[in-house]
Amino acid sequence: MASLFRVRDAGEAIRLANDTKFGLGASVWTTDRDEAARLIDGIETGQVFVNAMVASDPRVPFGGVKHSGFGRELGVYGIREFVNIKTVWIAKMNGGGGSHPTAIE
């Protein structure tokens, strides 16, 4: 089920969209690129579709915010949900000074 609302401007659309404890996805419809950018930046959701309905592709992350969950599945961000990143500091060996951090995935 989806709800459709006609609003006066981008500000009203953002207020209406954010007035919920959920934030999985939004679909906005406009012919104005600047308005689309304001909506994308302003709506608190895991994904925004402009002039399109919800779509999914295994190459891009999928997930929500607020009570719609946290973290992502699919894409490189989804893969990282299943790994632990370990930080390792390695000092120069054989009498050398200094050290540098390395992230190992």
For each predicted feature, which ranges?
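Conserved C-terminal structural/oligomerization subdomain of aldehyde/semialdehyde dehydrogenase
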Residues: 1-105
